[in-house]
Design a protein with these regions (language model features):
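RecB-family 4Fe-4S metal-dependent nuclease core
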Residues: 1-319
Length: 319
């Protein structure tokens, strides 16, 4: 079976080879999900359910059902605030775009498409491109677009650097190529970003009162929390990205070959040590502590995943 190359996996490969090795070659992952990832996934789930036809009320109810009981490892107040944040962001998003004129051609489109050598047209015998497109929509002018949802913890205003970076974002290019390979003649990407709130729970304030205050703030400053714009992809940009994909696949194959000759395969994958990389890495304590990973006996707090792409397996089970 060919290994899957997703946008998230390729980003990990570019960010730190050791992190990529542990996460995608060994399948190591934290047992407990970090708050930003958990909130983003639940928010995304609510949008998906609504796009698939569920009412706003049921979409919010379903997206927040995992917050019904606070786990032992979290603070009950923090847990309740997170739930209120999720409810308010979903309600605000539904309100903000209730008058949009998007026709959904597909919702949560999971894909596996060939990785092709751009110079020869040969198909990779080792890897396939995989992922999940949030949606394919028809715009009011009749064009097809890939719809991509994101949550962000930074400025998303019209002049923010956030939008400048998207001009070179590989995930967008991958999704355009995948959608076209699956028969959707997409012309652009509609990028929908929701900013996470910066207001915090006040002293003596209940989580419910915080949620009401957040929803009021969203109503008064919708553009602060929600932005949506087109991100085009030109044909020459897609051609360059195809070359980048093939180059990264060759790099990964070279790493695998070298690892096969070493007593500690992790040594073939050098570390990218720095504040920006280590500060956001789930393996930082293990890596900086010089811990050697045995996948048959993972460190406390970690597990070895049976599938390194659980987000894709989840979709396949629902299909």
């Amino acid at each position: 079976m060919k290994a899957k190359l997703t946008s998230t996996r390729l980003a990990a490969l570019r960010k730190c080879l050791r992190m990529h090795y542990w996460r995608y070659e060994l399948g190591l992952a934290r047992i407990r999900t970090a708050t930003p990832l958990r909130l983003g996934a639940a928010f995304h789930r609510g949008l998906e359910l609504h796009n698939a036809g569920l009412s706003q009320e049921l979409a919010v109810e379903t997206a927040t059902q995992d917050y019904a009981a606070c786990p032992q490892w979290d603070d009950p107040t923090d847990w309740a605030v997170e739930r209120e944040t999720l409810e308010s962001l979903l309600a605000g998003h539904f309100w903000r775009y209730q008058e949009d004129d998007l026709a959904f051609e597909s919702v949560e489109l999971t894909f596996e498409v060939p990785l092709v050598n751009p110079d020869t047209g040969a198909v990779s015998r080792t890897f396939r491109l995989a992922g999940k497109v949030d949606g394919v929509v028809r715009l009011p002018d009749g064009r097809l677009a890939v719809l991509e949802y994101k949550t962000a913890g930074e400025d998303i205003g019209p002049d923010a650097d956030y939008w400048l970076r998207l001009r070179c974002d590989g995930q967008i290019s991958l999704y355009v190529l995948a959608a076209r390979a699956m028969g959707y003649d997409v012309a652009t990407v509609l990028y929908d970003v929701t900013r996470k709130p910066t207001i915090r729970l006040r002293k003596g304030e209940t989580p419910e009162a915080y949620g009401e205050r957040l929803l009021k703030d969203i109503g008064e400053r919708p553009d602060y929390y929600f932005q949506r714009r087109e991100i085009p992809r030109l044909e020459d940009e897609l051609a360059l990205f195809r070359a980048e994909l093939w180059q990264q696949a060759k790099h990964l194959m070279a790493l695998r070959r070298r690892a096969g000759h070493l007593a500690d395969p992790a040594a073939a994958h050098f570390r990218n040590v720095g504040r920006m990389t280590c500060g956001q890495c789930e393996f930082a304590a293990l890596c900086l502590g010089g811990i050697r990973i045995d996948p048959d006996s993972p460190p406390a707090g970690y597990q070895v995943l049976p599938d390194v792409h659980p987000e894709l397996a989840h979709q396949q089970q629902e299909a």
